[in-house]
Amino acid sequence: MGLPWYRVHTVVLNDPGRLLSVHIMHTALVSGWAGSMALYELAVFDPSDPVLDPMWRQGMFVIPFMTRLGITNSWGGWSITGGTITNPGIWSYEGVAGAHIVFSGLCFLAAIWHWVYWDLEIFCDERTGKPSLDLPKIFGIHLFLSGVACFGFGAFHVTGLYGPGIWVSDPYGLTGKVQSVNPAWGAEGFDPFVPGGIASHHIAAGTLGILAGLFHLSVRPPQRLYKGLRMGNIETVLSSSIAAVFFAAFVVAGTMWYGSATTPIELFGPTRYQWDQGYFQQEIYRRVGTGLAENLSLSEAWSKIPDKLAFYDYIGNNPAKGGLFRAGSMDNGDGIAVGWLGHPIFRDKDGHELFVRRMPTFFETFPVVLVDGDGIVRADVPFRRAESKYSVEQVGVTVEFYGGELNGVSYGDPATVKKYARRAQLGEIFELDRATLKSDGVFRSSPRGWFTFGHASFALLFFFGHIWHGARTLFRDVFAGIDPDLDAQVEFGAFQKLGDPTTRRQVV
């Protein structure tokens, strides 16, 4: 046929059998990729330290999605929450991956069958004898079936009625586990951080989909609407489908980047806003304050802070710190976290407690400034030593660690104090192993960042695709030069200007 690459899909324009075939093949490719990617990630994933080397630090992309739907065990004998297991069951990570690959193979065979046997009776309009599809009826069928699936997921899988439930955690990502969730039918169900809203919204949306599907199966569209929206044209289906996909992509890009109950920080890493707002830092200080109120010493209070909470309060886990085009996992950037060194508290020679001003998200370098409790600058690492008034040496700054590996250790040497002040700019201080993976020290983004960037980018492209195909189907007559109200049978070549009966060619 000699079609250019951007026109090749016209081969399935009036061929319902092969249109079905290529969509089944597309499903085979998607499912096959998902299963294969899962097996690859399982081959490289190290489950030994779920606290300091979780899946999102290792750059896992499909494992978090399986986990949030209730998969936690591996045939390798490990659990995502730590420890070993003896009976993971069929629905382990490997089991889900295998199911996707088997399904992909079956879809592959089905696609070949439908490509070969394309001329089926079901696709033939008995009145005209030509291939055609009853698109409004197909829309009703698909709406009904997707409604059933949506309702079933919310009513059975999420609630644990027939299924594992979903991943649920506390606001600070410390106690996450898979559990059943009761639907939230009140105003709290609209809070994006309330897991109960996932169940209730799927039940409600599924019910609406079932009713809407039955409506479209039993009621035919009015003729004017049918013609006005070009409901008989397959390109209308393409345009509206693209609209549904790009809208969904924009929504999930938002829920991923800003955080929600569907994107737990234990599986996808913290959000950039938790660093910007000092979210974990405030919780850490609150816990320390509670410990001091219970007559614990400063050292004991800081020692009770979980490593997991301290690790979230580290700028290297901020997804906005990694460049969009820096390939690799977070571990390939600043290294594999080995242990928390403890919380450094700086004091000047007069005993004032000093706080290092933290680096904002979009800075690569930032001046080292130490302020007191009132926000007044008391010390810094000067840019020009000749003009310095607040240098560590002049102010006599010392540092002492509380909690962590260096608990109780103090340093007065200016070089060491400045080293830890620089590191305190980045949040809590961790020992990082950069040798194992030959990490280059340049921050990487987490799967949260990749997912958001990918879905926002493709949503924008698909938005333009929706406009393009919507315009093509709505203004098809204008582009083709044929008047839609022309009753006469137009014979191509009969007129000098297509569809204009005043320009009929003379028969010689």
Curated annotation (Swiss-Prot):
Annotated GO CC locations: chloroplast thylakoid membrane; photosystem II
GO molecular function: chlorophyll binding; electron transporter, transferring electrons within the cyclic electron transport pathway of photosynthesis activity
Transmembrane region(s): 21-36, 101-115, 140-156, 203-218, 237-252, 457-472
UniProt keywords, alphabetically: Chlorophyll, Chloroplast, Chromophore, Membrane, Photosynthesis, Photosystem II, Plastid, Thylakoid, Transmembrane, Transmembrane helix
Record's cofactor remark: Binds multiple chlorophylls. PSII binds additional chlorophylls, carotenoids and specific lipids.
Keyword presence, NADP: no
GO annotation terms (biological process): photosynthetic electron transport in photosystem II
Main location per the UniProt record: plastid
Membrane topology: Multi-pass membrane protein
Compartments it resides in: Plastid, Chloroplast thylakoid membrane
Statement: the UniProt record of this protein carries the keyword Plastid: yes
Disulfide bonding pattern of the chain: none
Pfam family, one: PSII
Origin: domain of life: Eukaryota
Subunit note: PSII is composed of 1 copy each of membrane proteins PsbA, PsbB, PsbC, PsbD, PsbE, PsbF, PsbH, PsbI, PsbJ, PsbK, PsbL, PsbM, PsbT, PsbX, PsbY, PsbZ, Psb30/Ycf12, at least 3 peripheral proteins of the oxygen-evolving complex and a large number of cofactors. It forms dimeric complexes.
Function per UniProt: One of the components of the core complex of photosystem II (PSII). It binds chlorophyll and helps catalyze the primary light-induced photochemical processes of PSII. PSII is a light-driven water:plastoquinone oxidoreductase, using light energy to abstract electrons from H(2)O, generating O(2) and a proton gradient subsequently used for ATP formation.
Family: Belongs to the PsbB/PsbC family. PsbB subfamily.
Protein name: Photosystem II CP47 reaction center protein
Gene name of the encoded protein: psbB
